[in-house]
Amino acid sequence: MSESEAPEPDQPAGAEEATGAKLFERWDVTGIEYDDPSTERYITVTPVEHTMGRHAGKQFQKSEISIVERLINRLMQTDENTGKKQQATRIVRNAFDLIAERTEESPVQVLVSAVENAAPREETVRLKYGGISVPQAVDVAPQRRVDQALKFIAEGTHSASFKSPTDAHEALAEQLTGAANYDVQTYAVNQKEEKERVAAAAR
């Protein structure tokens, strides 16, 4: 290799090739817009959908994982789908194709907007005063907000597709587009509103 072909010392190996990488070899992950500054730090978007558990066991490092992979992992957290990573990945890939076909928008942007809209700002905790449990409203940490949003989206997908003629990728596409549009009929947004309603009553 000549000196002209050698990479710069500060440049990561393969940086030029990585710049043009796309999620599922289709979707560009650059130029994503965030409407909620509190969760922007915890919604990571990368073209890598499977990191082989690189951050497993490291506290709070889940925020370094792509939000797409975190959604895939969430979809596996039912008895029927435990460990079926390829199946969950295929569901997300097909859902993204369906979202792009229906909305003509970037499905990655739709996912980010859905997570932001489904993330609850308040919830309740139980405090004991003299042996009596009293609900108390508390603010939700940004990282937990993202966790809860992914949980609601996965639960809504499972409930809409389990023992139903609706395919899982169709149910997921409906959940994401509904949440991105802040449709209160969507399971994820409905659960967020319910949590905040209960918290408001416990102030």
Curated annotation (Swiss-Prot):
One of its GO terms (cellular component) is small ribosomal subunit. Belongs to the universal ribosomal protein uS7 family. The gene is rps7. Keywords: Ribonucleoprotein, Ribosomal protein, RNA-binding, rRNA-binding. GO terms for biological process: translation. InterPro entries: Ribosomal_uS7 (IPR000235), Ribosomal_uS7_arc (IPR026018), Ribosomal_uS7_CS (IPR020606), Ribosomal_uS7_dom (IPR023798), Ribosomal_uS7_dom_sf (IPR036823), Ribosomal_uS7_euk/arc (IPR005716). The keyword rRNA-binding applies. Part of the 30S ribosomal subunit. One of the primary rRNA binding proteins, it binds directly to 16S rRNA where it nucleates assembly of the head domain of the 30S subunit. Is located at the subunit interface close to the decoding center. Residues 1-22 are annotated as: Disordered. One of its GO terms (molecular function) is structural constituent of ribosome. It comes from Halococcus morrhuae (Micrococcus morrhuae). HAMAP family: Ribosomal_uS7_A. It comes from the Archaea. This is Small ribosomal subunit protein uS7. PANTHER family: RIBOSOMAL PROTEIN S7.
